[in-house]
Amino acid sequence: MPFEMRGERLFKIDERIKLKNLEELSVNREHKPVRYIFALNKRIGFLDSAMGLPFVFNNRIAALEKKNYIEFFNKEKFDIIIGAGVEYSLLLGEIKKSITAKTIGWQHSTYDSYFEKRGATGYGLMKYVRKCYSALDGIWVLTNSDKREFDSNLGINSKVLYNPLPQNDGVRTTYEKGHIVFAGRLEREHKGLDYLVEVVKKILEEVPELTVDIIGDGPSNNWLKKELETAELGKIVNLVGITDNVYQFYSKASVMVQTSRWEGFGMTILEAMSCGVPVVAFHNYGPDEIIRNSVDGYLINKFDTDAFAQKVVELLKQPERKRQMGKCAIERSRDFSLEKVLPLFKRYLEEAMRGL
């Protein structure tokens, strides 16, 4: 379930909200031959044709699984169903004509990560994707850059809805000397962990008192440990793992670094900025939307680790510059507060109900 990890609830959910494990509606397709056809298509894209479209519609999601979802949605008599991410957006698009509810596809990553990267969910299936997305009553995306991509490529009119910043109870950083922080899922390709190691090595050459907190867990955890050992960085890097209080680490940081190859939004960026921590990140849709370059952080051309490290070093060596950018970061983070995002969320729901 999306609200659990290793059997533990990640978020506090109001008791009035009923949770349904969607695995109960899914069908095991592990041994179906079509599974291998779709896996091959993610590398070659041969199904993206007029002839391939019927096959995709009939086989990508099992008929029994679609039937289970249709029966469940209609039985519950929902007014609106929001599909979070590309998979559930496509599902809702397929079954739209068979359910009574209004449907919204809420995209939580970038257009290119969903559709243009080999191996991505929608890679090589763009005719199918366009048909599914155009059937929905609304598409929400995270940034204005994504809106341009989704709209121009899919022929839709999406709406931008930011992820709201979680509550920060007045936590402010003390700008501990030479201390930087990274927070995110430990996934080498996505989060650019190889670039992170490079950047830390280069910063250490200029800042001998450097210390680093790396917050998060993921499939590349062991790989990262080995890389840090090989680079002789183990003594200055603290692998925090998962924590329920990230603010205790932001409260010491002088700079946050974000090395992702792609980033749909960047909640950790906002969390750090709300504590007064300036952020250095590679240009990406999310960081570009949040960070005002040279005002509350720095945006670096992909994937220039020399320039990245140099900007971090500048901030670590210029206390007044760092503090001024930190003040601007706090100010910017308020643009993403729940008080600002929630009214837009409500308005978009109302517009979906009215067919706007």
Positions of the model-derived regions?
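N-terminal strand-loop element at the rim of the active site
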Residues: 1-56, 149-151
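An aromatic- and histidine-rich active-site surface loop
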Residues: 57-70, 80-100
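Donor nucleotide-sugar binding/catalytic pocket of nucleotide-sugar-dependent glycosyltransferases
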Residues: 102, 130-169
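Conserved donor-binding/catalytic core segment of Leloir-type glycosyltransferases
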Residues: 172-191, 197-200
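Aromatic "clamp/platform" in nucleotide-sugar-dependent glycosyltransferases that forms part
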Residues: 242, 261
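Conserved acidic donor-binding segment of nucleotide-sugar-dependent glycosyltransferases
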Residues: 293-294, 298-305, 314-319
